[in-house]
Every structure is written in structure tokens, then in C-alpha cells.
Amino acid sequence: MILAIDTHRERDELAFTLDGEGRDCLLRMLERARRERDHEFDLPDVEPGWSRRSGYDQCEFINIFPCMPEDRCTISRGYGKDGISSVEMALTATSLDAFIRMLERMGSGEDTLAIRPAAGSPFTLRLAAAE
């Protein structure tokens, strides 16, 4: 499961805390994004399991879809009355490949992976609080 998502506003950083199952789910999602560049799709196989400390209660991956290239990668956050309600992260194809390589290097135990902005953005990863 994804154990926590922490945002560090001062560094514009998004940190995923994952166990082996969460790592595998995230890896499958990103590999699918790399293969299906022209399609928006849902990810019903990813289980909710977010930590309260990062402002999430029960959340899930909603969509990953292509977007228009931008000058640089953006990480934007939406805030509800109880904290963060959504996170969007745009990735270039190069950043997507780098993200996949980082996940592949992670072990099967609990670990944290920090993501920072990079140049360009043909992909957007959107996470949102479940209703």
C-alpha cells in the first residue's frame, strides 16, 4: 500500500512512503502510462490506504493522462477544510522513465521516494481524496 504522501511546500517536493505492494502498484501505473500515451484511464486495482498525517483519509489513484507540454514540471495541490484533497504532478517522458527506474531500485520493504519538479510535462499524475 501507499502508506503516506507528504508534501514539502518549501521544496515543492512530493514524498511517497510505500511498502512492497504500494511500490508494485505505483510501478504498474507508471508503466501503463508509458505504454498508453494517448489514453486516459482509471486504475481500479490500486487500493486506498493513505496516512492521516499527510492530510489524506481514504484516497486512491484516479487517472493518469497526457496533457499539453509545459515549460516545467509542476506539482500543484488542492486544499480542502481537512487538509490536502488533491495532488497533481506533471511528468515528461524522461521524468516518467526516471521515476520508474527509482521504483525498480527500491526494495520490497517500507521506503520513501521523494519527487521534485523537472522540465516539461506531457504526463499528469492526479491523486484525489475518495468521496
Model-assigned labels for residue ranges:
Residues 1-131:
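Positively charged, low-complexity terminal tracts
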